[in-house]
Structures are given as structure tokens and as C-alpha cells.
């Protein structure tokens, strides 16, 4: 039988992976599969190929069905189980997944050792205590320090193992202190809309609920608005199922990107993050005051809690408190912290209650 070979260069591991497929794939499917195996997201592939995200998503779903691949999380495993693959230069033949050891690879061949996880405290506006945290991943510099935590750095690519790694890190960090946390403490994990398609989010959420329960800790999935949210609208049933399992949803950077008022109407969000550009000049611009107040009042009527994200001055914090905003986050209160520093800050805050 004629075969098609796909060759992948894993630079971090000084290896080349060769995979042989039966001649059942078109040139477009071969190119798409190669990019998916390299860790490119649907969004990145759409830009490289000048195709819409929707088109690439549909092509990927058809490809996975043809190859009997369950999801992105199982892509490498399913490929190694069903097709012949081998590594160079070691020439390890592996007709099934269990007979080989493949390094864990995330986006574009980067290992998780290249990343740090940071926790930014979210404060209760009424009493000033830490009410939750925003969890993000930042890529390290060559010297081991972290890149600046701007939104372009911390929004990881969804088509990789970082989601599972992130959940594992959170479980390990909070398990020893879960009984010390105040009731309603919420942990916010940033994801992209296409993660609903490309990552086994629901499984990770259910495992989290199994470990921590629902009485003390709230798990919040926060959706980026940098890309279109049509995927969220398309998979509302999945979101509602997740929500019915006591996982909460948040809309990030409201007022920016693709965030629309209709999303508040059609998707069961419990939180919205009010982007700092919506209030950064609140002290000098009356129009900003009107817009921010309108968004806050609308959210209240929809029973959605507002998190003022990007507080830089005490006056901004005071303004938000006066308007009845429940939660505050920003460098005026605390910068994102490594895990150990965050836990120390959190436990110190709890002792003051």
C-alpha cells in the first residue's frame, strides 16, 4: 500500500519524527495535520492559510473524524496508536504508543519548562480581602525571568498541553490549603473561545470539581475577546452543561475586541472583566464616566458581577467602589505573583479576617 510520510522537526529534543499514513489524505489535509501536530492553533492556521477560523475548524473536525482522533489532547497518542511512526536519529520504531517514549511537547515544540504560572489576586471591593485570583501562563526569557505579563504574552495557544498542565498546577497548589480558603473563593483560568473545540475543558473542569467540591471554591473559565466568539455561540449547549456543573463563566476585557452586549444576553456569564481602557481616564473624562457607569449598571441588572481589571490608582479603585463594583484587580493592589508568593500573600490576608 502506498503511504504518505509527514516529517516533524522537534528542535527542543534534537529529534525528527516521521509518521506514515495510508494514501487517504489530500494535500490540504496533510498540510493541516502537519500544522496541528506542530502545535499551531486553529486561529494561527487560519492566518497562515488566509482562511476563516470557521473553515479551518470544520476542516480539522473532518480530518479528526477520518483519522479517528478524539481531540487535540489525544492527537499524538491517537496518531501513534493507529499509524507507524519513528524518531530520528535514534530510529526507534513504534507501531503503538506504549512501545515508545515521546517527550511531552506543547505549542511549537516548547516544553513546559519554558513557562511560569502566575497568580494575580482579585480583591473584594467592600472589605479589601483577597476574594480570588486570575491564573495565567507567561513565557520565560532566556535568563529564566518572565516576559512582561501583557495580554499578548499570557494568552497561551489553545492547541497544546498547557491547559492540562495549568489545571494540574492549580490542583497541586490549592489542595493543601483548600480548607483555609473563604467560601466563594474563585479561581479564574483564562482560555480562548476555540478551546471549547480543541481542548477537553469539560473533563478538566469535572475533575477540578471532584477534587475541590463546589461549596468553598468557584472555578471560573474566562474567555478572551481577542478573537471572534462565534464558537461560543455555536457551543452554547456545552457551556450550559459546564455551567450546570457549578463551573462559572467570565467574559474578559469587556469593552474591547469582539466583546458584544449580545454575549451577555445569550451566554450564561457570571462575571465580566471591565477593561482598564474603559476607566483609565475616569478622573478627567465625563464620557468615560457615562460609559463605565452604563456597563456597570447593565451588569447589575443582568446579575453579572463586575471585576474592574487594571486598577492603577487609588482614585480608580475608589470610583469603582462608589459605583458598586464587587471586585478589583490591578497593579495598584498587587502585580501577578509566582505561586509561592501568592500563597504567602493569600494566607496573610486570611489571618486578617
Swiss-Prot record:
Residues 18-83 form the HTH luxR-type domain. SMART domains: EAL (SM00052), HTH_LUXR (SM00421). Gene3D superfamilies: EAL domain, Winged helix-like DNA-binding domain superfamily/Winged helix DNA-binding domain. GO terms for biological process: regulation of DNA-templated transcription. Pfam families: EAL (PF00563), GerE (PF00196). Residues 98-350 form the EAL domain. The keyword DNA-binding applies. Residues 42-61 bind DNA. Keywords: DNA-binding, Plasmid, Transcription, Transcription regulation. Disulfide bonds: none annotated. This is Uncharacterized HTH-type transcriptional regulator YuaB. It comes from Escherichia coli (strain K12). The lineage of its organism: Bacteria, Pseudomonadati, Pseudomonadota, Gammaproteobacteria, Enterobacterales. The gene is yuaB.
Amino acid at each position: 500500500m502506498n503511504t504518505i510520510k509527514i516529517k516533524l522537526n522537534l528542535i527542543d529534543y534534537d529529534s525528527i519524527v516521521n509518521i506514515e499514513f495510508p494514501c487517504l489524505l489530500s494535500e490540504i489535509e496533510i498540510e493541516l495535520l502537519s500544522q496541528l501536530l506542530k502545535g499551531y492553533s486553529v486561529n494561527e492556521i487560519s492566518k497562515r492559510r488566509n482562511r476563516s477560523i470557521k473553515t479551518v475548524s470544520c476542516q480539522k473536525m473532518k480530518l479528526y473524524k477520518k483519522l479517528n482522533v478524539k481531540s487535540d489532547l489525544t492527537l499524538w497518542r491517537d496518531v501513534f496508536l493507529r499509524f507507524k511512526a519513528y524518531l530520528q536519529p535514534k530510529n526507534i520504531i513504534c507501531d503503538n504508543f506504549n512501545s515508545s517514549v515521546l517527550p511531552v511537547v506543547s505549542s511549537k515544540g516548547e516544553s513546559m519548562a519554558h513557562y511560569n504560572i502566575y497568580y494575580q489576586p482579585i480583591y473584594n471591593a467592600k472589605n479589601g480581602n483577597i476574594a480570588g485570583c486570575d491564573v495565567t501562563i507567561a513565557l520565560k526569557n532566556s535568563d529564566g525571568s518572565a516576559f512582561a505579563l501583557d495580554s499578548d504574552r499570557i494568552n497561551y495557544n489553545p492547541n497544546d498541553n498547557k491547559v492540562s498542565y495549568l489545571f494540574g498546577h492549580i490542583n497541586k497548589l490549592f489542595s493543601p490549603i483548600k480548607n483555609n480558603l473563604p467560601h466563594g473563593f474563585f479561581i479564574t483560568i483564562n482560555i480562548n473561545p476555540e478551546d471549547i473545540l480543541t481542548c477537553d475543558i469539560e473533563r478538566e473542569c469535572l475533575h477540578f470539581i471532584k477534587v475541590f467540591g463546589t461549596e468553598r471554591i468557584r472555578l471560573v473559565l474566562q474567555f478572551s475577546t481577542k478573537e471572534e466568539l462565534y464558537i461560543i455561540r455555536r457551543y452554547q449547549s456545552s457551556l450550559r452543561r459546564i455551567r450546570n456543573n457549578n463551573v462559572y463563566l467570565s467574559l474578559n476585557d469587556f469593552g474591547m475586541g469582539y466583546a458584544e452586549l449580545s454575549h451577555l444576553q445569550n451566554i450564561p456569564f457570571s462575571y465580566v472583566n471591565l477593561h482598564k481602557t474603559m476607566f483609565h481616564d475616569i478622573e478627567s473624562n465625563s464620557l468615560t464616566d457615562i460609559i463605565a457607569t452604563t456597563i456597570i449598571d447593565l451588569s447589575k441588572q443582568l446579575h453579572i458581577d463586575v471585576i474592574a481589571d487594571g486598577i492603577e490608582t487609588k482614585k480608580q479603585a475608589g470610583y469603582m467602589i462608589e459605583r458598586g463594583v464587587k471586585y478589583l484587580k490591578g497593579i495598584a493592589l498587587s502585580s501577578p505573583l509566582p505561586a509561592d508568593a501568592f500563597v504567602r500573600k493569600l494566607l496573610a490576608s486570611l489571618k486578617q479576617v
